[in-house]
Amino acid sequence: MQLIRSSDYGFWLLSQGSHIHLVNNYLPEGRAEDFHLQGKKGMVIGELDRQPLWLVEEQPNDTRAYFDLRDQLYLPERTFNLLNRGVELNHFFKTHQFCGKCGDKTMQTEDEWAVQCTNEECNYRTYPVICPSIIVAIRRGKEILLANHRRHAPKYGKGGMYTTLAGFVEVGESFEQTIHREVFEETGIKVKNIRYFGSQPWAFPNSQMVGFLADYESGEIRLQEEEIADAKWFRYDEPYPEFPEKGTIARALIEATLKLCAEHQDK
């Protein structure tokens, strides 16, 4: 990052954790001095509406109004992904101030998004950590499997949002192996015909959601109760529970699978 000058112009992204500063529901636009940002550290991370998008180093004691990045899912995909980029970079810089190899201080590199050890005998370079997570929608004929995760259920019970299954990729696993493992661990179900669907950066704090469609192969629902409060097969034409928000890859997976369910019914 560089010192921001009074005359620097563009959109300004300030973050605190996964929250971002907004003015009238949008990123502030103007000269740095308009927002008292001169002298702070920042860098351009992209372009928004043909103007530079500046990421400002996280200001822990800033009193501006900050809003949850999750609430910005209505924005165009490219805009939301740029905001994810900024939030993830600030998280990376904040959590990698010391070298993971020798323990000396790090400094941000000028040629790429990375930090490098200041110890000349080490010079170890570290890049932003991205933690891939699979997310999968499972179809059985004209039904979709949806789960009520513990984090979405009211305390001590069921209810709330039902969504797809997801889980982090473990060391040495392919995405397909993760799908088989996670689905079986959480529901006791085995799947087949796994197809890639799409992906979404998810800066909470540094995930990449990799989406798949899959078909039911065998098994009866058996819950991993510490993770899953409930899981059911829902017909495409029956009343649905609460779904994830539009703009999430989970919602897109569900809608794509419900369409496949309807097409199966018509055959």
Swiss-Prot record:
Pfam families the UniProt entry points to: NUDIX, Zn_ribbon_NUD
GO molecular function: magnesium ion binding; manganese ion binding; NAD+ diphosphatase activity; NADH pyrophosphatase activity; RNA NAD-cap (NMN-forming) hydrolase activity; zinc ion binding
Residues reported in the UniProt entry to bind a divalent metal cation 2: E182
Record bears the keyword Manganese: yes
Motif (Nudix box): 167-188
Any GO CC annotation of this UniProt entry: cytosol
InterPro entries documented for this protein: NAD-cap_RNA_hydrolase_NudC, NudC-like_C, NUDIX_hydrolase-like_dom_sf, NUDIX_hydrolase_CS, NUDIX_hydrolase_dom, RNA_Hydrolase_NudC, Znr_NADH_PPase
Residues binding Zn(2+), per UniProt: C99, C102, C117, C122
Catalytic activity: a 5'-end NAD(+)-phospho-ribonucleoside in mRNA + H2O = a 5'-end phospho-adenosine-phospho-ribonucleoside in mRNA + beta-nicotinamide D-ribonucleotide + 2 H(+); NAD(+) + H2O = beta-nicotinamide D-ribonucleotide + AMP + 2 H(+); NADH + H2O = reduced beta-nicotinamide D-ribonucleotide + AMP + 2 H(+)
Binding positions for a divalent metal cation 1 per the UniProt entry: A166, E186, E227
GO aspect biological process, one term: NADH metabolic process
Positions of the Nudix hydrolase domain: 128-257
Role of this protein: mRNA decapping enzyme that specifically removes the nicotinamide adenine dinucleotide (NAD) cap from a subset of mRNAs by hydrolyzing the diphosphate linkage to produce nicotinamide mononucleotide (NMN) and 5' monophosphate mRNA. The NAD-cap is present at the 5'-end of some mRNAs and stabilizes RNA against 5'-processing. Has preference for mRNAs with a 5'-end purine. Catalyzes the hydrolysis of a broad range of dinucleotide pyrophosphates.
Similarity comment text for this entry: Belongs to the Nudix hydrolase family. NudC subfamily.
Name of the protein in question: NAD-capped RNA hydrolase NudC
Species whose genome carries this gene: Mannheimia succiniciproducens (strain KCTC 0769BP / MBEL55E)
